[in-house]
Amino acid sequence: EFVAAFQERILNTHPSLLPAFGGSMHAVAQALEHGVKVTGCTIHLVTDQVDGGPILLQQCVEVFPDDDVETLHARIREHEHRLLPLAVRAFAEGRVRVEGRCARVIAS
């Protein structure tokens, strides 16, 4: 009910480049298990589909050969912490345009 009441007005962070490894609390572990060379983070709008809302911002993060879940997740979090305020600001300033499943952030 909460999500339905605020459809596409809630921001979420996810520790992968959605749609890869979406819907999981273990996205970083899955990235390592699959041997991806690049993962990252996504800031997206929340919809009734888990991790399926329009994507606002993404940032790539290189996966190093000696990474484990903790080291990789720490680097991803740094980017999430940088991107989330940018997304909140764009949203608050009315610079987010949603068309279907696609979102654009208009430059300030």
Each model region followed by its residue ranges:
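Donor/substrate-binding cores of folate-linked one-carbon enzymes
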Residues: 1-105
